[in-house]
Amino acid sequence: MPRSLKKGPFIDLHLLKKIEVAAEKNDRKPIKTWSRRSMILPQMVGLTIAVHNGRQHVPVLVNEDMVGHKLGEFAGTRNYRGHVADKKAKR
């Protein structure tokens, strides 16, 4: 269920400050964050944000199509390796 337009997008303040500083300095280093719940804003386009997936930080290069989505959508937390093959079918 999307957030109400009356409330506006949610973004953690500490992440917003880091983004403003990086944009001001034209810094190309990834911004490390644990805030998967923050929404991607137009100010983030072109920046690389390292989003934590529970084990490591996954670098996410933000483009215009990602605006409006959450950061956590682009850093998967589960590792699916497929089902084990049935040994009876091989015989």
Swiss-Prot record:
GO terms for biological process: ribosomal small subunit assembly; translation. GO terms for molecular function: rRNA binding; structural constituent of ribosome. Keywords: Ribonucleoprotein, Ribosomal protein, RNA-binding, rRNA-binding. One of its GO terms (cellular component) is cytoplasm. Pfam families: Ribosomal_S19. InterPro entries: Ribosomal_uS19, Ribosomal_uS19_bac-type, Ribosomal_uS19_CS, Ribosomal_uS19_SF. Coiled coil: none annotated. PROSITE patterns: RIBOSOMAL_S19. NCBIfam families: rpsS_bact (TIGR01050). Protein S19 forms a complex with S13 that binds strongly to the 16S ribosomal RNA. Belongs to the universal ribosomal protein uS19 family. This is Small ribosomal subunit protein uS19. It comes from Pseudomonas fluorescens (strain Pf0-1). The gene is rpsS.
